[in-house]
């Protein structure tokens, strides 16, 4: 199989909008191994995955953005800030339900990382693909089990894929991971 095709597949698998599905299932069932945990996971998936996907689809459908990957950094600000709004709504739903701290913490980290990423994107194209994996892994390491440190290895093939597809420079890849790890750690601690 051609290397670019493999890189494209990896970029799709590690799409930042898909990662929260696994994150919310793992964390929710860890903190509430019951039907309640399932409901927390479902709420997280709705506000952190599905609603942002619908928003980006609508923006692409009405030509407000050139592609759903938000490849052009100049088009990222409005979608990212709008997505932050969806995350904030999700956070308040969790807060009203008195969700456990880890659920609130991962939701808050999504708010902070995406908000900062939106402003960075006004000036520079940071890799939000890398941020979308590095932050959730950091949350799993500190909120669930340190064994999840092994999941940082996923950043290697993803970084290679983003570089191979010429979506980012090496520095953009490193900074996308680094800022997400740092901000997530600060928020959850």
Which role fits each region the language model picked out?
Residues 66-83:
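Juxtamembrane helix-capping/reentrant segments at transmembrane boundaries
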Residues 100-189:
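Membrane-embedded catalytic cores of phosphoryl/pyrophosphoryl-handling enzymes
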Residues 19-23, 81-92, 112, 131-134, ...:
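Core segments of transmembrane alpha-helices
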Residues 16-21, 48-57, 87-91, 114-118, ...:
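Transmembrane alpha-helical segments of multi-pass membrane transport proteins and ion-pumping complexes
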Residues 10-30:
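The first (N-terminal) embedded transmembrane alpha-helix
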Residues 27-39:
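Short, hydrophobic transmembrane alpha-helix segments
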Residues 36-51, 109:
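Alpha-helical transmembrane segments
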Residues 1-8:
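Short, Lys/Arg-rich, polar N-terminal cytosolic tail immediately upstream
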């Amino acid at each position: 199989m051609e290397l670019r095709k493999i890189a494209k597949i990896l970029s799709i698998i590690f799409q930042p909008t898909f990662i929260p599905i696994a994150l919310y299932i793992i964390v929710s069932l860890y903190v509430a191994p019951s039907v309640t945990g399932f409901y927390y996971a479902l709420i997280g998936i709705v506000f952190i995955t599905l609603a942002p996907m619908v928003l980006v689809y609508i923006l692409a459908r009405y030509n407000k953005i050139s592609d759903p990957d938000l490849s052009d950094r100049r088009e990222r600000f409005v979608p990212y800030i709008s997505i932050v709004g969806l995350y904030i709504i999700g956070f308040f739903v969790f807060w009203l339900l008195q969700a456990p701290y880890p659920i609130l913490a991962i939701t808050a980290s999504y708010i902070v990382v995406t908000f900062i990423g939106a402003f960075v994107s006004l000036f520079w194209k940071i890799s939000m693909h890398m941020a979308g994996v590095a932050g959730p892994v950091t949350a799993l390491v500190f909120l669930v089990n340190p064994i999840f440190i092994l999941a940082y290895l996923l950043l290697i093939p993803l970084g290679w894929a983003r570089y191979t597809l010429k979506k980012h420079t090496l520095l953009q890849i490193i900074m996308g991971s680094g800022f997400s790890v740092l901000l997530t750690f600060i928020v959850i601690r």
